[in-house]
């Protein structure tokens, strides 16, 4: 082995349909934020394979000039504003972007992707509460594989349904097959339409 990649690489194999389906449902010009499992999100947003691999190898023309690595891929020119290695930290950034959009009088939608482990972070619930209170146009996309590291939801939370838990904040929720891009797109499009019409 040559030890050529100087970055941790967190694969998202099997979850590609989520990024593809959601991004296909978003209006043009939407902003997105993601997690460290961001490869499919970066590529679905329009980032090039050349830039993707350059970043993993720590070289130009990586989107982070070869310094961001796999876990911090971004492509603002394609609407992918930020991803982060720290669990849950792009959720408040996305809510802030949606607040800025509303403050300017725009009707754009912001999407934020996160794993179900991010629901253990207080900042998730604080962000959800603020988005609900201000009726911000944010699509919260939970990529739920049922585990945070190795711990199932039933051993981490008192609730069993994420969509029911967020409904307490008067937010719409839906759950579908994350391996079916067509199903994801259909569900996301319905939510985006409602969000644009009525706010969060």
Locate predicted features.
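Cofactor-binding active-site loop characterized by glycine-rich and histidine/acidic residues
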Residues: 4-134, 152-158, 163-170
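Thiamine diphosphate
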Residues: 142-200
């Amino acid at each position: 082995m040559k030890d050529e990649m100087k970055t941790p690489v967190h694969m998202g194999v099997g979850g590609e349909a989520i990024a593809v389906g959601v991004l296909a449902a978003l209006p043009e010009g939407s902003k997105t934020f993601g997690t460290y499992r961001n490869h499919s999100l970066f590529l679905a947003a329009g980032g090039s394979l050349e830039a993707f691999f350059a970043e993993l190898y720590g070289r130009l023309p990586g989107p982070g000039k070869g310094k961001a690595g796999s876990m911090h891929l971004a492509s603002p020119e394609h609407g992918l504003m930020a991803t982060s290695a720290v669990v849950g930290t792009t959720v408040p950034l996305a809510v802030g972007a949606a607040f800025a959009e509303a403050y300017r009088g725009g009707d754009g939608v912001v999407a934020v992707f996160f794993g179900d482990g991010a629901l253990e972070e207080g900042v998730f619930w604080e962000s959800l509460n603020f988005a609900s209170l201000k009726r911000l146009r944010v699509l919260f996309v939970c990529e739920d594989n049922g585990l945070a590291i190795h711990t199932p939801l039933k051993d981490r939370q008192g609730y069993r349904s994420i969509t029911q838990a967020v409904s307490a904040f008067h937010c719409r929720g839906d759950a579908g097959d994350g391996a079916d891009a067509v199903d994801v797109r259909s569900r996301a499009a319905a939510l985006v339409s409602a969000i644009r019409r009525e706010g969060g």
